[in-house]
Amino acid sequence: MGRPVDKSVEQAFYFTKSPQTLVESGATVAYPPRTSNYHYEMELVLAIGKPGFRVSEDQAHELIYGYAAGLDMTRRDLQLVARDKGRPWDTGKDIEEGSVCSEIVPMQGVVVEQGAIALEVNGQTKQSSNVDKLIWNVREIIADLSTYYHLQPGDLIYTGTPEGVGAVVAGDKIIGRVEGIAEISLTVGPAE
């Protein structure tokens, strides 16, 4: 996110989200509490279809059920405070109705290696990139994550966002897409 990564010395890192963060594409969600800097992050989402633990990169495709387009909405102000203090990012990332997901497109065993990924806010392009620019590709993510957890059918893995993240306000309409996968939409409603 906004800085170069040397994969030879840095490891991928992950965070988890509670089930109540998941919301279907097309929803209107309230601007969340305790933030004044709510950001979009457009992502390719992969859906796990078979259990796996300590899976090699060569076997990673065997766990793939399919893909979706997703939005990882973030309380950026809270995330940055936590990051700078070396604390967990939970309050910045684990937001009710903050994980927007399209329908899952079944693509068993397929490894998506490229495809345009884009996001618009109120008709203006904010993110435009390609899946081939992911820091860690789909095979690497599955293999690495499976060294920490027993991956299970139904697990959704958001794979990271391209450059161009930014803030939204109540009333904004977000449309995102991953080429060959799906399109998603979200309207940001007023705060509760």
Curated annotation (Swiss-Prot):
Pathway info: Aromatic compound metabolism; naphthalene degradation
Alphabetical keyword list: Aromatic hydrocarbons catabolism, Hydrolase, Metal-binding, Plasmid, Pyruvate
Cofactor: Mg(2+); Mn(2+)
Keyword Cell wall biogenesis/degradation: no
One Pfam family named in its UniProt record: FAA_hydrolase
Catalysed conversion reaction: 3-fumarylpyruvate + H2O = fumarate + pyruvate + H(+)
EC number, as in UniProt: 3.7.1.20
The keyword Glycosyltransferase belongs to this UniProt entry's keyword annotation: no
InterPro entries named among the record's database cross-references: Fumarylacetoacetase-like_C, Fumarylacetoacetase_C_sf
Molecular functions (GO terms): acetylpyruvate hydrolase activity; fumarylpyruvate hydrolase activity; hydrolase activity, acting on acid carbon-carbon bonds, in ketonic substances; metal ion binding
GO annotation (BP), single: naphthalene catabolic process
Binding of a divalent metal cation, residues: 41, 43, 72
Record PANTHER family: ACYLPYRUVASE, FLUTATHIONE S-TRANSFERASE
Protein task: Involved in the catabolism of gentisate (2,5-dihydroxybenzoate) a key intermediates in the aerobic pathways for the metabolism of a large number of aromatic compoun such as naphthalene. Catalyzes the hydrolytic cleavage of fumarylpyruvate to form fumarate and pyruvate.
Family listed: Belongs to the FAH family.
Protein name stated in the entry: Fumarylpyruvate hydrolase
Species this chain originates from: Ralstonia sp
